[in-house]
Structures are given as structure tokens and as C-alpha cells.
Curated annotation (Swiss-Prot):
Expression tissues: Laticifer.
Protein name as it appears in the record: Ervatamin-C
Gene Ontology molecular function, alphabetical: cysteine-type endopeptidase activity
Binding-site positions, E64: 25
Cellular compartments annotated: Secreted
Length: 208
């Protein structure tokens, strides 16, 4: 495995987005991984529509939260997802619009529970969605450096791991580019279930 990887430097990650006051982190983290695997497979980096998931993925709950697996399943069952340009983000749930199927995926896989080595293996291949406990003031007010807590393991926020170094994960948040390190946070790698539960619920999409 590479000692370090940063998918941003490989051109596989879109600019940081902002979910606003809508609890749609699940859509942002899912879409982020789909954008990345599509770029890795096709060479085209296309910003995709979180709003389509918020409006149309009825197994999830729009601005009231959702699960990665249902979001991936929606994209698979729907035959693809539209672009951000065609179906822009509104930060409120609305009626499902007719949408183009611009980027598709074949499936999704989970990473073994609380296995940081397996998570590193996954991220070496592509960015992965993870759920974390983002409820601490220290997390919310993070501005720079390697974050080491405090935080619990009550999973309440979906984010994307886009790379790693020997001692930290490079994590893409959806709170805009003025949060953290231009929208990112470096989270200490601690083994096991990970800091803030980061290794408890990782998934990634598959695309041939």
C-alpha cells in the first residue's frame, strides 16, 4: 500500500461544498465518492447533484438525515445521478424533479467494521464515505492542524476520506471552504474503531 495518498492531488475530488442548514451530510459524502470513482474510471471530474438525493431518495429523509447504503442504492436503482449544474443544491427538500442519468455506479461495498488497516486499503483505491461523531465543540470549531479530539463514537455526521498520511486521515467535510483547512480536517489515525468512530461505518461505490 502507498505510505500516503491524496486524491485531491490526483484531480479526483470536486471543490468543497456546503450543505447549509439542511441535514444532508449523507448525500454530500455519498455523492463525493461517486464523483471520485467516476473520475478515477473515466478521467472526467463532474460535480453531481446532492439535491437529487435529498428530493428523490425516498428511503432517506432529505434534510433530516439518511444512510449511505440507501443513497448508493438509489443511484444504482435509478440508473445514475444528475449533475450539480442540472439539478442545483437548494438546502431544502423539494419535489423530485425529472433528472438525467449522467453518472452511474455498479454497486457499493462496506469496509470491515473497526478495521483501520482495511479502511486504509480502501482509501488507497478510492475515496470512501465514513460516519463520525461531529458533535463536540472542538470538532465544530476546528480550524487547522491534526485533530485528536475530544469526540465520542455516536455516529451523527457523514464525511469523506480522500487520503491519508502515516498518522492522519484527510477528511472532506460539507460545511463550506471556510471551515477547517479550506473545508478539510486532518484526523489522527488511532487504530481500531478510529477517532470519532471513523472506522465504524465506511463504504465506497464500485464502478467498472
Amino acid at each position: 500500500l502507498p505510505e500516503q495518498i491524496d486524491w485531491r492531488k490526483k484531480g479526483a475530488v470536486t471543490p468543497v461544498k456546503n450543505q447549509g442548514s439542511c441535514g444532508s451530510c449523507w448525500a454530500f459524502s455519498t455523492v463525493s465518492t461517486v464523483e471520485s470513482i467516476n473520475q478515477i474510471r473515466t478521467g472526467n471530474l463532474i460535480s453531481l447533484s446532492e439535491q437529487e438525493l435529498v428530493d428523490c431518495d425516498k428511503k432517506n429523509h432529505g434534510c433530516l438525515g439518511g444512510a449511505f447504503v440507501f443513497a448508493y442504492q438509489y443511484i444504482i436503482n435509478n440508473g445514475g445521478i444528475d449533475t450539480q449544474a442540472n439539478y442545483p443544491y437548494k438546502a431544502v427538500q423539494g419535489p423530485c424533479q425529472a433528472a438525467s442519468k449522467v453518472v452511474s455506479i455498479d454497486g457499493y461495498n462496506g469496509v470491515p467494521f473497526c478495521n483501520e488497516x482495511a479502511l486504509k486499503q480502501a482509501v488507497a483505491v478510492q475515496p470512501s464515505t465514513v460516519a463520525i461523531d461531529a458533535s463536540s465543540a472542538q470538532f465544530q470549531q476546528y480550524s487547522s492542524g491534526i485533530f485528536s479530539g475530544p469526540c465520542g463514537t455516536k455516529l451523527n455526521h457523514g464525511v469523506t476520506i480522500v487520503g491519508y498520511q502515516a498518522n492522519y486521515w484527510i477528511v472532506r467535510n460539507s460545511w463550506g471552504r471556510y471551515w477547517g483547512e479550506k473545508g478539510y480536517i486532518r484526523m489522527l489515525r488511532v487504530g481500531g474503531c478510529g477517532l470519532c468512530g471513523i472506522a465504524r461505518l465506511p463504504y465506497y461505490p464500485t464502478k467498472a
